[in-house]
Amino acid sequence: MPAVSKGDGMRGLAVFISDIRNCKSKEAEIKRINKELANIRSKFKGDKALDGYSKKKYVCKLLFIFLLGHDIDFGHMEAVNLLSSNKYTEKQIGYLFISVLVNSNSELIRLINNAIKNDLASRNPTFMCLALHCIANVGSREMGEAFAADIPRILVAGDSMDSVKQSAALCLLRLYKASPDLVPMGEWTARVVHLLNDQHMGVVTAAVSLITCLCKKNPDDFKTCISLAVSRLSRIVSSASTDLQDYTYYFVPAPWLSVKLLRLLQCYPPPEDAAVKGRLVECLETVLNKAQEPPKSKKVQHSNAKNAILFETISLIIHYDSEPNLLVRACNQLGQFLQHRETNLRYLALESMCTLASSEFSHEAVKTHIDTVINALKTERDVSVRQRAADLLYAMCDRSNAKQIVSEMLRYLETADYAIREEIVLKVAILAEKYAVDYSWYVDTILNLIRIAGDYVSEEVWYRVLQIVTNRDDVQGYAAKTVFEALQAPACHENMVKVGGYILGEFGNLIAGDPRSSPPVQFSLLHSKFHLCSVATRALLLSTYIKFINLFPETKATIQGVLRAGSQLRNADVELQQRAVEYLTLSSVASTDVLATVLEEMPPFPERESSILAKLKRKKGPGAASALDDSRRDTSSNDINGGVEPTPSTVSTPSPSADLLGLRAAPPPAAPPAPVGGNLLVDVFSDGPTAQPSLGPTPEEAFLSELEPPAPESPMALLADPAPAADPGPEDIGPPIPEADELLNKFVCKNSGVLFENQLLQIGVKSEFRQNLGRMYLFYGNKTSVQFQNFLPTVVHPGDLQTQLAVQTKRVAAQVDGGAQVQQVLNIECLRDFLTPPLLSVRFRYGGTAQSLTLKLPVTINKFFQPTEMAAQDFFQRWKQLSLPLQEAQKIFKANHPMDAEVTKAKLLGFGSALLDNVDPNPENFVGAGIIQTKALQVGCLLRLEPNAQAQMYRLTLRTSKEPVSRHLCELLAQQF
């Protein structure tokens, strides 16, 4: 950029600005401005032609007046004339005026475009940069239509100077963000990728920003950028390389470019090329290693640059979710930041660890920092950091630490900021339900929630506790006793009155034998709260009173007196008046038998999915973690509620006040299958079917009933749509895509992630399995801005799979808006052992063109594993029983991934097997046991994995009671190491 000479200074402009600043009042300023406008207008209209300097000076004055907030309605043509000047300073002022004052509807736009085209066509790099800056600053659609085709040509031209290339890249980025349809994809796309190798810092930085934006909507067109980005990143972070060493910022080479390259790589899955992937892993390890080195400078700029690269590296590791070693190292590095003196670092560490907690590989590592996170929740001064600590506790919670985390969050709730109390309440309610084994603890937790933060307990929370208490006989008496005691508090929240009124109305008879909670005492306690409550709560209490008349006839006269009172029969609220009149008449004219029939105890609610999680997601907003982020398999527990909370049903829970009046009774849910324990192992290592006794649910099986298979004559209770979609036959769909097997293998040891992604569609999966039942959620995301038409995903059973696996689907909307996501629920039942997965066919129309693809659904036989613990003696006894040649499958293979004991352990647990300690004489070996649960039979499975670190080899041996199962499990598991 040429320097401005001393003669280019505009004294008249400086004097005018000084006069404006010296004005003592608004009126004086306006007077001075009007005087100057009159002078400028006379100069422009005068007979004497103005030279370039004068035009520039007067245009600058007009621009200054406009920036002061005054309208300018003349001088535009003079500014346009400056664009034709060959002097840089005059052309610069002309472009500045145009960028600020001229809108796209101006009559001068054609003249402006011609001037810009002339400058772009010139070979003067300074003029070209001014024109490109103007296009980017205006950024209108009209500008895009005029120049979108020219700018890519300038960008990739071999004779363009570096400054022009940089400006062209940023200008094209601005136009693409404003009007993506105007930027044509063509031959230049392949050439722009090679700008990543440019030696000019400005060019490569601008190119990375442009490519990152372009590849989000056209990933296939820019796929070659992966290897180039990895190569450039490797050269920057490697101490042996001299690439961009001149651009070192406080001892950190090219930090902004490094961050942008890492962000670009997050637009794609892990590299398929082994060499590229290895080089990238080496880069990531180098960044993590440098984070452990002592700082080279004490200045904050050094640590900021270093940490910016580190956090972006961790984001890339989390995005890939395929390198267990890196995930654990990232978690350990973030753990060091949890106690850093810098608040921002603590915040970022907590935020990143929330995402790490959802990975099966790093969840256990995150849990080791629970004490530090709890301390942050108690002691942090910044509310946003405390909120992130609460988020992390929620994310790291599983069966092993649920009571501790819920207790700490309840304690924090007493002093929590009002802005986040509702969110904390929802999280506590979800965790209490999700990990409840002892339901008395669940009841205590919810009542504590109401006591501590009653104003923030939404209807979804207390509706849910009523539903669970109604459905479980073993907790009804305890719930009645607990709410009775809670209602005795002098200050009792209205939500507590609602819960107490409902539960005592239904189950008050269970505690009526105690003189301290006799029927008159119960009624007196409830009625003492009546006049302090809202209309809705009083309506519920009136329903409780009529229930009392049925449960406790001795209270009839007292309650009728309350109903007969003028304050009820002539109540200004129609709802209360009607209830009082109808209940009084019902209790007076109906016989005891009729009254008992009308007011009988509520039947169990049909099993439905909790709506509390949906409330939390709405509270967090669309920018919260993706539906896939929370899903993980809880390897510390053998219960399905260790997984993700299901997405709520569209059918809402009935109002408790309506329930007291008696809704249509729904049949109680079928009893779940009997639990499988270690003592059943002796019976399952045979080919014969095993009967499952029909027992009532135990607390440990609380959530298994949600996955109970339907009765033969009825659809699955969990599905809102009772009519499953008709699946096309295998002959109606195309073959699976070439990478279907590779995508399937990613899910053998995990239950959540992205199943498929291209430039149009993303398909995510999260699933949970228990015994022979499973539920899978498929998320279809439209990545384009155009609506998908005739969207039809179907599940197909090839061959004999129909008799081996039952999959029932819920229909999805036929239209998927641009940028939207739809969910499909699949309920799965394993009937017999199977070897091939079902197929997922997705068909839709995009822009008038039919699209279709076929994938393999990630449902493999190991998903129905039940981990089984046993002693060494029992293991070897079973091992010998399964000694027939057809019962054993063995494979010796070379390691495809780094041999790490912790990673191997995590994969075996993710596979579904229990790991047995002190069984194999060689402590380096892994021994596991489990039972494959099917409806027809159970197949016992024993495995032994022998790693040889020196030879980088494994030997895997599996023994089951069925030869095909042994071979299939061996093949599935061997591909994971």
Swiss-Prot record:
Bias type Low complexity, positions: 646-657
Location, primary (coarse class): membrane
Tissue specificity note: Expressed in the brain (at protein level). Isoform A: Expressed only in neuronal tissue and skeletal muscle. Isoform B: Widely expressed.
Keywords per UniProt: Cell membrane, Coated pit, Endocytosis, Membrane, Phosphoprotein, Protein transport, Transport
Any single GO BP term: positive regulation of receptor-mediated endocytosis
Cell compartments where the protein resides: Cell membrane; Membrane, Coated pit
Tagged with keyword Cell membrane: yes
InterPro entries, alphabetized: Adaptor_Complx_Large_Subunit (IPR050840), AP2_complex_asu (IPR017104), ARM-like (IPR011989), ARM-type_fold (IPR016024), Clathrin/coatomer_adapt-like_N (IPR002553), Clathrin_a-adaptin_app_sub_C (IPR003164), Clathrin_a/b/g-adaptin_app_Ig (IPR008152), Clathrin_app_Ig-like_sf (IPR013041)
Pfam families: Adaptin_N, Alpha_adaptin_C, Alpha_adaptinC2
Sites bearing Phosphothreonine, chain numbering: 653
Membrane topology qualifier: Peripheral membrane protein
Entry's Gene Ontology molecular function annotations: clathrin adaptor activity; low-density lipoprotein particle receptor binding; protein kinase binding; protein-containing complex binding
GO cellular component, one term: secretory granule
Region (Disordered) residue spans: 614-702
Residues the record lists as Phosphoserine modifications: 626, 652, 655
Statement: the UniProt record of this protein carries the keyword Nucleotide-binding: no
Coiled-coil annotated spans: none
Family that this chain belongs to: Belongs to the adaptor complexes large subunit family.
Assembly, per entry: Adaptor protein complex 2 (AP-2) is a heterotetramer composed of two large adaptins (alpha-type subunit AP2A1 or AP2A2 and beta-type subunit AP2B1), a medium adaptin (mu-type subunit AP2M1) and a small adaptin (sigma-type subunit AP2S1). Interacts with HIP1 and RAB11FIP2. Interacts with SLC12A5. Interacts with clathrin. Interacts with SGIP1. Interacts with RFTN1. Interacts with KIAA1107. Interacts with PICALM. Together with AP2B1 and AP2M1, it interacts with ADAM10; this interaction facilitates ADAM10 endocytosis from the plasma membrane during long-term potentiation in hippocampal neurons.
Job of this protein: Component of the adaptor protein complex 2 (AP-2). Adaptor protein complexes function in protein transport via transport vesicles in different membrane traffic pathways. Adaptor protein complexes are vesicle coat components and appear to be involved in cargo selection and vesicle formation. AP-2 is involved in clathrin-dependent endocytosis in which cargo proteins are incorporated into vesicles surrounded by clathrin (clathrin-coated vesicles, CCVs) which are destined for fusion with the early endosome.
Stated name of the protein: AP-2 complex subunit alpha-1
Provenance organism: Mus musculus (Mouse)
